[in-house]
Swiss-Prot record:
The modification N6-(pyridoxal phosphate)lysine is found at residue 278. Homotetramer. InterPro entries: Aminotrans_3, Aminotrans_3_PPA_site, PyrdxlP-dep_Trfase, PyrdxlP-dep_Trfase_major, PyrdxlP-dep_Trfase_small. This is Ethanolamine-phosphate phospho-lyase. It comes from Bos taurus.
């Protein structure tokens, strides 16, 4: 399709007709993307960008097998799921086969938000309880029911935490309440959940569910310590609640060895409800809730029929089947393991070289780089992170920054990401970090101790901009600056190199 408008015309029309809260990546200088293929995106000038952040185009942008499956089915039939059709049952059968046996009943929706909203309904109907335990910094969707259980959202806005919502500390062993030097961080964090349950019961409240991403994404690429989920599930089920695993961002083989991220934590841990979305349709809007027969029967016993007009329609199911085929036929799980390990190795070498890198954490092709101003206090390097993602864009590499302090570089590329891509990305990052550290006077020798503060002496100009950014932090709307959505005001304040 030919372009209808110039980049500036497109931007002007967007500002006029699209809600101002709907942000674009790199808002101060957005990229106009006109096509994409595999792990590469192309702007209106034909410039190629390496996509390191798009976990929606899971098997690669515009994968020919996925496109062909959608086109073929659209030529035959697309209608709602009240009609009997093979695609939905075939997809449900194959999807269930990737999960533990007890997770066998599917409800198809169109987005992760719809899936998580339905999961809450299932949980509340199961025992008749209402309260929900969520993790600090969590994000589970944009519906009102999910904003209420997403501290990532309601803590940044004017909303007040609802009485039925209980927030447990995120199991972050790098900068959380219990860190890597704790004798048993898994038990310590799980005991925080138990305290919440006990306090709720003492107040006459009952827990319906504990919900968590198997690995927190918006929370800063957090991987819970081994054993944490098992203990939490024990406490929650003992209170009559269910465990909801949100796999919307981290499922479908992204971690490599396992198809679902929750499977990393052992065969003795099986959630009661699993939600999935983003990568499921490789850009086609589809999502799902999978649960046990017992929970599904309790939901049906309410007498209220569940119907979703587009959920599980023939075209969506055909797309979903094609995505499963590509993951298997192209060994994308194996690729996630191999390339993820290689990328992590390269990044750990950078960690010994650059004092701005405080922590590298991740599994497969889900990796976070926690940037810090000093290693002893682990002070988040927020402005530096924003500076880096813009500089990476100039090098034609797309990254974003997130986490509660927006200082964690997020890496979650399409699953066809290669070792050559990983090497190129790290080379660009190395050059930018080197330039930034030279400009700020930071040492970059590999012999620096992890526990030694980086006593950086920044140029007056850069230092004043960082101070100004810090002073405005509490006054500016944080929602305008997350996910790499750097606003004009923030861009004007980023470090100059």
């Amino acid at each position: 399709m030919c372009e209808l408008y110039s980049k500036q015309e497109t931007l002007a029309l967007r500002r006029k007709h699209i809600g101002p809260s709907c942000k674009v990546f790199f808002a101060a200088d957005p990229i106009k993307i006109v096509r994409a293929q595999r792990q590469y995106m192309f702007d209106e000038k034909g410039d190629q960008y390496l996509d390191c952040i798009n976990n929606v185009a899971h098997v690669g942008h515009c994968h020919p097998e996925v496109v062909k499956a959608a086109q073929k089915q659209m030529e035959l039939l697309n209608t709602n799921s009240r009609f009997l059709h093979d695609n939905i049952v075939e997809y449900a059968k194959r999807l269930s086969a990737t999960l533990p046996d007890r997770l066998s009943v599917c409800y198809f929706t169109n987005s992760g938000s719809e899936a998580n909203d339905l999961a809450l309904r299932l949980a509340r109907q199961f025992r008749g309880h209402q309260d929900v335990i969520t993790l600090d910094h969590a994000y589970h969707g944009h519906l009102s029911s999910l904003i209420e259980i997403s501290p990532y959202k309601f803590q940044k806005g004017k909303d007040v935490k609802k009485e039925f919502v209980h927030v447990a500390p995120a199991p972050d062993t790098y900068r959380g309440k219990y860190r890597e030097d704790h004798v048993d961080p898994a038990s310590a964090y799980a005991d925080e959940v138990k305290k919440i349950i006990d306090e709720a019961h003492n107040s006459g409240r009952k827990i319906a569910a504990f919900i968590a991403e198997s690995m927190q994404s918006c929370g800063g690429q957090i991987i819970p310590p081994a054993g944490y989920f098992q203990k939490v599930a024990e406490y929650v089920r003992g209170a009559g609640g269910v465990f909801i695993a949100d796999e919307v961002q981290v499922g479908f083989g992204r971690v490599g060895k396992h198809f679902w991220s929750f499977q990393m934590f052992g065969e003795d841990f099986v959630p009661d409800i699993v939600t999935m979305g983003k990568p499921m349709g490789n850009g086609h809007p589809m999502a799902c809730v999978v649960t046990t027969k017992e929970i599904a029967e309790a939901f049906s016993a309410s007498g209220m029929e569940y119907f979703n007009t587009y959920g599980g329609n023939p075209v969506s199911s055909a797309v979903g089947l094609a995505v499963l085929d590509v993951i298997k036929n192209e060994d994308l799980q194996g690729n996630a393991t191999r390339v993820g390990n290689y990328l992590t190795e390269l990044l750990n070498k950078q960690k010994t070289k650059h004092t701005l890198i405080g922590d590298i954490r991740g599994v497969g092709l889900f990796i976070g780089i926690d940037l810090v101003k000093d290693h002893q206090q682990r002070t988040p390097a927020t402005a530096e992170a924003q500076h880096i993602i813009y500089k990476m864009k100039e090098k034609r590499v797309l990254l974003s920054a997130d986490g509660p302090h927006r200082n964690v570089l997020k890496i979650k590329p399409p699953m066809c990401f290669t070792e050559e891509d990983a090497k190129f990305m790290v080379e660009q990052l190395d050059g930018i970090l080197t330039g930034l550290e030279e400009a700020t006077g930071a040492e970059t020798e590999s012999g620096i101790s992890k526990n030694t503060p980086c006593r950086t002496k920044m140029p007056k100009e850069a230092q004043s901009e960082l101070l100004r950014d810090s002073s405005l932090e509490s006054r500016e709307n944080p929602s305008q600056k997350r996910n790499g959505l750097c606003t004009d005001s923030l861009l004007s304040k980023r470090l100059r190199t």
